[in-house]
Amino acid sequence: MRLLLCLLLFSTLLINSTNACPGVITQACFCSEVHSGIVLDCSNSSASGILQIIRTNQAQVGLIQSLTMNQAELVELPPNFFSGLFIRRLDLSQNKIKKIDDAAFAGINPVLEEVVLNHNLIEKVPAAALAGLPNLLRLDLSNNSIVEIQEQEIFPNLNKLYDINLGSNKIFSIHTSTFQNVKNSIQTINLGHNNMTAVPSSAIRGLKQLQSLHLHKNRIEQLDALNFLNLPVLNLLNLAGNQIHELNRQAFLNVPSLRYLYLSGNKITKLTAYQFQTFEQLEMLDLTNNEIGAIPANSLSGLKQLRQLYLAHNKISNISSNAFTNSSIVVLVLSSNELKTLTAGIISGLPNLQQVSFRDNQIKTINRNAFYDAASLVMLDLAKNQLTEIAPTTFLAQLNLLLVDLSENKLPKTPYSAFNSRVGTVLLKENPLVCTENLHMLQQGTGVYVRDSPDIICGRKPTPKPEPVLVPIVTDSLISTQRPALVQIPKMQIHRNVHTTTGDQAPQIPSGAFQQIDLGKSRSLPRGHSRFILDKPSTREQSVEPTEELTPIQPIILPSREDEIRQSSMEAGTSQESVEATSQKIPSTTDIIDRPNVVLPFPVPFLKRGPNLSESKKVESTDMPSTSQVFHTLPPSILIEPGSTPKVAQPSTEANIKSEHIDEFALASSNSNEPTLQPRLEKSFFTTTIIFICVGTAVIVLVVVIAGLCISKHRQLQFENTYSDSSAARTSEYISTQYRQNSLRGTGGRVGRFEESPAWIYNPGSSYCNYYK
């Protein structure tokens, strides 16, 4: 029989590979192809008609990985309702099913692994109907109308069933033998959101494979002795949202693997010393929203595996100094309590502590040694308290401190001295900081001045700064390659209140002649550019009469450096006539007078009268040989070639020119004192050769080293591969064997479901216990 079923399944899979979703089915359902079958969603359609179409096209459909029929007008499940179909997951949620026949699942028993029947009107557990599903792994009966589980409704012998969800029903009583037939396979039981007033200890006792037990949102008032007995692998117990007043230390016996314990939303009033000492593997303890008034000494000590402790929304007003001794807590939440002071050593004995929250308490003072032992602290929340000051060096030992929240306190000034130089962020919003307190950034524990940032104190408007005025700069690229004309500074005329008012016109006040230039943007100018810094002195403006008009500045001839070189080279090889034609008439002194009342552009050459030079004389060339006499009228750096004194034309008497002609001298073409060009070229060539040789040698050495490393790595990999072939084959065979075994048992993906530790969270939130949505 099994061989026939396997052949039928194999043939249907072959046909399915050619045409997975027939057109008739796609018209009524949403069909998608997966790795080993199809997924059908036939919601909002008649279930009877859909199943008839699937049976007709069973040869083409093959294995159905998931069949969903939500809101499919189902009221009951008649006998053989799914016969002839190969379905692995059946979802019949959100219908109005009240009755399930004992033979409703007949015909699909070989492959059915999961049945979802939540959000229906089922009043009893369909134990007889489930008895024909030996391969069932998961059963969801949540959000129904089950009131109690009687003896005839206990779960049948299902050796692979590991997940039962009975949450959100009306269960108040469970028979002792409810889970007796599945005690060797059951791993998760959800009985949350029911009406139980006591822990069903007799029903869950001795479940050796039970890992997660959810009893949240019931009416349990107390934990009696031996409530949780012989649960060796239980790692999650959820008792949140009940009415528990006191924790009995004898309630947990032989529960060594408990890692997550949820006790939030109860009415626990006190904790005793060493109350949780038996939980050697406890990693997370949630006591949020209880009525705990104090944490006595050693009540939470000795928990070497505890990482997260939540004590928010209680009435804690006192914490003993040794309450957390020898614990490895990383996240500690004590927000929304009644603490008024943080004494010295309040969180001592916590070397791994990283996150602490004292938000929304009544803290007024903090002892400077309160956090001395918490050297690994990273985040501290002290918001919504009544702090008026923080003593210096309070957080000096916390070198890893990144965030301190001091919002909504009563701090009149910034407590800079309380932190070390490595603090990352300090939040100070909603504090009554005094008006003289300048807030600024911190860098290495000191204030950082931000350039161009205005200081706003007591709501005073910041002083406006003058906007920079850009002065156009003439670059060399704008100068023509031809011999330019005279380059002169533009004339500048500054009028002071010279505008007269006529009629109703108001007098126009001229703006300042010069503004300061933003030097920060002009520091990267090329060396050859000119940069003018123009200032607006207010004292000078007041000294000028209203009707005075300043004399315009005379143009100044500023020949460029190229013109001077070109002119000197031309003068050396031209005749006397060309010298006369190209000579220029330059006044002996500048016309600019040192007048402090005149606003001039800066810099201006010869702002003051220059030094007096030696008197120059004219030299006339004669036919008689004579010794040339050198007059030192030029700087010593300019040499005059001997015997090449040019002749300068005599001034004409008819022209009646009052200006003087300055004699021009040809520059020396060569000198014995100057070094020749050949040694310089040889020295430059020698230096360049040395540089090229060094660079080439370095490149060759680098290439050889890289090649050697590549060859060594290749040989190492080749050597390792010679020994890894056999081990890789054995590993692949082992993985394949485990996969086949898990496929037969169906529990491979469930073993580690609750082994993963949840991510550390700063605040659990309001819906942290809604494990089943």
UniProtKB/Swiss-Prot annotation:
Gene3D superfamilies according to UniProt: Ribonuclease Inhibitor (3.80.10.10)
Residue spans crossing the bilayer: 690-710
Pfam families: LRR_8
LRR repeats by residue range: 61-84, 85-107, 109-132, 133-157, 159-181, 183-206, 207-230, 231-254, 256-278, 279-302, 303-326, 328-349, 350-373, 375-397, 399-421, 486-516
Compartments, record wording: Apical cell membrane
Disrupted-gene phenotype: Highly lethal at L1 larval stage due to excretory defects. A small percentage of mutants die as embryos and a very small number survive to adulthood and are fertile but have defects in locomotion and egg-laying. There is no maternal effect on lethality.
One GO CC term, this protein: apical plasma membrane
GO biological process: embryo development ending in birth or egg hatching; epithelial cell development; nematode larval development; positive regulation of membrane permeability; regulation of tube size
Tissue: In L1 larvae, expressed in a subset of epithelial cells including epidermal, vulval and rectal cells and the excretory duct and pore. Absent from internal epithelia such as the gut and pharyngeal tubes. Transiently expressed in the excretory canal cell at the 1.5-fold embryonic stage but no longer visible in this cell at hatching.
Membrane topology: Single-pass type I membrane protein
Organism superkingdom: Eukaryota
Alphabetized InterPro entries for the sequence: Leu-rich_rpt, Leu-rich_rpt_typical-subtyp, LRR_dom_sf
Membrane-side (Extracellular) residue stretches: 21-689
Primary subcellular site in the record, as a coarse category: membrane
Signal peptide, first to last residue: 1-20
Sequence ranges on the Cytoplasmic membrane side: 711-773
Record's keyword terms, sorted: Cell membrane, Leucine-rich repeat, Membrane, Repeat, Signal, Transmembrane, Transmembrane helix
Role: Required for apical extracellular matrix organization and epithelial junction maintenance.
Official protein name in the record: Leucine-rich repeat-containing protein let-4
Phylogenetic lineage: Eukaryota, Metazoa, Ecdysozoa, Nematoda, Chromadorea
